[in-house]
Amino acid sequence: MANTDILEQLEQLKYFLATAPANWRSEQAIRKFMLPNGEYVSCILWKNLFHITGTDIVRCLVFRFQAFGRPVKNIKKFEEGIFSDLRNLKPGIDATLEEPRSEFLEMLYKNNCIRTQKKQKVFYWY
């Protein structure tokens, strides 16, 4: 992949992250951005708030590291570190804490935004 392609993809991701909640259609629940590896990052509208999952945050960071020539060698350790940092974000202020198999988690799981329906935080977009 050429450097200009990578830089363009980084700019597109940056633009998506900055603008995904804008110009939302009333019937829309999820807006997706496809990363070069075929995975998606999603902006989710739920109960009039925009959200992003920890899984999607990890996906964004893995792509950015790869784009800058620093591929993640141990994805499990990398994820553990990111999720450890995300624990500092507080439910009700920075995130919603969803109970196992909640309606919201079920929707996120069906749309490949999360890997498990265990109790977890889903983060507010802004």
Regions found by a protein language model. Name each.
Residues 1-41:
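Eukaryotic partner-binding/assembly regions in large regulatory complexes
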Residues 2, 6-9, 53-57, 61, ...:
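Alpha-helical interaction elements in eukaryotic regulators
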Residues 3, 23, 37, 48, ...:
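Detector for Asparagine
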Residues 13, 44, 61, 82, ...:
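Generic structural hydrophobic/aromatic packing signal, biased to beta-strands
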Residues 16, 64, 85:
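Residues that form generic nucleotide/phosphate-binding pockets
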Residues 24-31, 48-50, 70-76, 101-107:
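Short, functional N-terminal and low-complexity linear motifs
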Residues 36-74:
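Conserved, ordered domain cores of eukaryotic regulatory proteins
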Residues 75-126:
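Chromatin/DNA-recognition segments of nuclear transcriptional regulators
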